[in-house]
Curated annotation (Swiss-Prot):
Domain of life per record: Eukaryota
Organism this protein belongs to: Macaca fascicularis
Taxonomic lineage from the root: Eukaryota, Metazoa, Chordata, Craniata, Vertebrata
Keyword list, A-Z: GTPase activation, Phosphoprotein, Repeat, SH3 domain
InterPro entries, per database record: ARHGAP12_SH3, PH-like_dom_sf, PH_domain, Rho-GAP, Rho_GTPase_activation_prot, RhoGAP_dom, SH3-like_dom_sf, SH3_domain
The protein, known as: Rho GTPase-activating protein 12
PTM annotation (Phosphoserine): residues: S165, S201, S213, S215, S240, S593
Amino acid sequence: MKMADRSGKIIPGQAYIEVEYDYEYEAKDRKIVIKQGERYILVKKTNDDWWQVKPDENSKAFYVPAQYVKEVTRKALMPPVKQVAGLPNNSTKIMQSLHLQRSTENVNKLPELSSFGKPSSSVQGTGLTRDANQNFGPSYNPGHTVNLSLDLTHNNGKFNNDSHSPKVSSQNRTRLFGHFPGPEFLDVEKTSFSQEQSCDSAGEGSERIHQDSESGDELSSSSTEQIRATTPPNQGRPDSPVYANLQELKISQSALPPLPGSPAIQINGEWETHKDSSGRCYYYDRGTQERTWKPPRWTRDASISKGDFQSPGDQELLSSEENYYSTSYSQSDSQCGSPPRGWSEELDERGHTLYTSDYTNEKWLKHIDDQGRQYYYSADGSRSEWELPKYNASSQQQREIIKSRSLDRRLQEPIVLTKWRHSTIVLDTNDKESPTASKPCFPENESSPSSPKHQDTASSPKDQEKYGLLNVTKIAENGKKVRKNWLSSWAVLQGSSLLFTKTQGSSTSWFGSNQSKPEFTVDLKGATIEMASKDKSSKKNVFELKTRQGTELLIQSDNDTVINDWFKVLSSTINNQAVDTDEGIEEEILPDSPGIEKHDKEKEQKDPKKLRSFKVSSIDSSEQKKTKKNLKKFLTRRPTLQAVREKGYIKDQVFGSNLANLCQRENGTVPKFVKLCIEHVEEYGLDVDGIYRVSGNLAVIQKLRFAVNHDEKLDLNDSKWEDIHVITGALKMFFRELPEPLFTFNHFNDFVNAIKQEPRQRVAAVKDLIRQLPKPNQDTMQILFRHLKRVVENGEKNRMTYQSIAIVFGPTLLKPEKETGNIAVHTVYQNQIVELILLELSSIFGR
């Protein structure tokens, strides 16, 4: 079968593989042949040996050996190609070959640099760098080549007309390169023009530029020719970097930042942050006197030491192409790393930068191509641009956006994030809108985050919010202990509520997504917090949080700093909530001042119409105040769950309750549920095959258990409980979930020793032990065993024997307090004891 073409269309976000070696094999229905350089869509990594792929979306998938292919980086949507005027078809054939490729000739040869680390003024080149949004038109003929030579001499920003190199007229230049609409940028520092004039020299002194077919990238504005820089030996080094303005080619070059003339806005080590006359930020190294528009490494990774900074020598190894694009894009982006006006910035669940338009709610993503240049494409993949689109919004829309943004300018404590497989990162809340941006610059009229003004604002308890990944487990819910189950959850503190979600995409998280719902929420009003003791958890860095609702949590983190920060913030929030509640009650109790009453009376006399409406509103507000006051008093004075249970307002459940307490609550010696089940089975189930041995539907049994625990009116004749095995299953579950079995723990060994005695002595010994049990245990045991005796007596119909009943009920009614290694031996004794009681029922309990 024919395999995929390597130049096929690449779908954004799709995973691809590229064949490294030829391979073929016979499948069931076809022959699979793959060739080196071919690309396929990766469907599934089935195992370490075989991957499932397909040529395109509509083709049938097949398997390829994983060792013969490699996974290609996911391609994002590349910027669109813009057509420009091409070359006329009747032009002189002066181009023999023009292809795109990356230069590898002078990899190890560095260009001669000026005092600023720039190439000297005389440079050579064979290629032409296109603008980021430009491309050769359709009439461009790749079969032609041209050798140009220009002598670029620094002469007050102009070119020296006395150059000995051949001149290229504007007419020829237009004929060769076509018309380039819009501004065209050519980095002179990385452009070289060859001195050779021979059109027939196939490759000597000139660089062949061809499309890299193996890369799979089409000839578009996203790909850039690599142009090398060399210096003739007879040229000296100028005193300043070369900046040339090629008027006819519309070529411009960004200059270095100016020398600092004012105090630094920010200082971090040797690096200072300054602003130029236009208000744009730049960076200056006091030690090396290096100036750059691009933020140094310390703004992106605070953990990098000064020794990791790039020296001027290291900058020689950097591609001037990278410097060019970083400079040009810094102009289009906002000056201090924040998104452009009219756009808000956030991260999606995959960690990609996502921009949302404040006017149209349109979402765009930022990506970086193979050349290290960033561009933007719409979330639906329909458009791509080098810069975010600009929208003209009405003044009303702008006012609304400014108003909404002003509400989010609260400065808060740093957000502590824990990256997966990485250490904890402290992220300042000022970087919320641009998590990947550099350190922000602050205007002169605003304080930096380290200033006292900032700290006071950040420590405001009412605006306090915190996010992070924590390990959490419940140990009690509604006053009842639950089993510990440690989970890693994304915790969000917002106001007086602490929310826990499975993922980071919660509506309250700083990513702003609405895709996750909180697993559970904890109300911090009236809560208490303390470091957990060792008996609560053996883990380190654990604190215990108790709420008024009876919920108890254990919260843990392996990072000491993270857990200490959370403990401080939660303690502060709990204390502030208590203070706010007390102040609210006191304010409502205080009477109005006499001056206010006098002012109100004078106002009422002047305006009788407003008086009536004022009285109605005042009555409503007074009623609301009374209601709030009563509610606050109720909440602050509400008793604990344990106190309510002790007073008898909340009853314990039937399943899992102590037998003596349950009988005392029901004013009897046998639980009502046991009587109800036995009566129902004896009426409808004695002739059912395998009664008590056959299991019922566990889901229906749980529904029956729920109804019994909630004191619902129970009718076992209801069609919901028509399966007799559901009733017998619920009865067995009742005895299985007793905190202490029917044969109590302290008598287990005595019963085992009794069954080991001689047959004549066994009955008397067992009878004496049963009489030592509590009264509820004796009576419940008697009614149960008499019922089981009747079941065995109907064995011809239900095929149940003494031995089968003993196997079912032995481990349920009789078990040790702590299981040991003698489980098999104990099981034998348990079955023998139950079987003995059934056989000698009349001797033990009487007739």
